[in-house]
Structure formats: structure tokens, C-alpha cells
Amino acid sequence: MAVSTEELEATVQEVLGRLKSHQFFQSTWDTVAFIVFLTFMGTVLLLLLLVVAHCCCCSSPGPRRESPRKERPKGVDNLALEP
């Protein structure tokens, strides 16, 4: 699938023409879709930054100390079996 040099030059000229005219998108929908995409990417990057900050800053170097839990009996006493 070879691309001819004429097609490549036409594409380059089209891109350069859009850059010179400051018309990057063809329609309003293209602009809206790009803004939604940037918002999504910003949200994902913010969440990743928060996860990294939580992992790096909030973890203690020593082992965790958990309070000893009381032993609870499992199950239910069947009072009908008692004399």
C-alpha cells in the first residue's frame, strides 16, 4: 500500500493551509468532540495522579498495626437441644 508523492504533498499542503487559516476543525461538532476528549483525558490523568500520590505519600513504611479482634462464636446456639 504505497502512497504517491502527489497525495502526500496534497495532504501536507492541506494541513499547512489549515494551520495558516487557524481553522483546525471542519465543523462545530469536531470542536465539541475534541473538547470532550480533552476533558476525558484530563480526568484520567488527574485520577492517575491522585492514585500515585496516595500510594507514595499515604503509605507508612512499617507494617500495619491492627487491633486484635475479639473472637466471636460462629453459628447460633440451638436452645432446643439443652435439657
Swiss-Prot record:
What membrane topology is given?
Answer: Single-pass membrane protein
Which biological processes are named by the entry's GO terms? lipid droplet formation; positive regulation of cell migration; regulation of actin cytoskeleton organization; regulation of cell cycle; regulation of cell population proliferation
Q: Which domain of life is it from?
A: Eukaryota
Q: Where in the cell is it found?
A: Membrane; Late endosome
Q: Which Pfam families match?
A: SMIM5_18_22
- Annotated TM spans: 32-52
Known CDD domains for this protein?
CASIMO1_SMIM22
User: Which Cys pairs does UniProt list as disulfide-bonded?
Assistant: none
Induction context: Up-regulated in breast cancer.
Q: Name one GO cellular component term.
A: membrane
Give me the ranges of the annotated region Disordered: 60-83
Q: What keywords would UniProt list here?
A: Endosome, Membrane, Transmembrane, Transmembrane helix
Listed Basic and acidic residues bias regions = 63-75
Q: What is its main location?
A: membrane
Q: What does this protein do?
A: May modulate lipid droplet formation throught interaction with SQLE.
Binding partners and assembly: Interacts with CANX and DDOST. Interacts with SQLE; this interaction modulates lipid droplet formation.
Protein name as annotated: Small integral membrane protein 22
Native organism is Homo sapiens
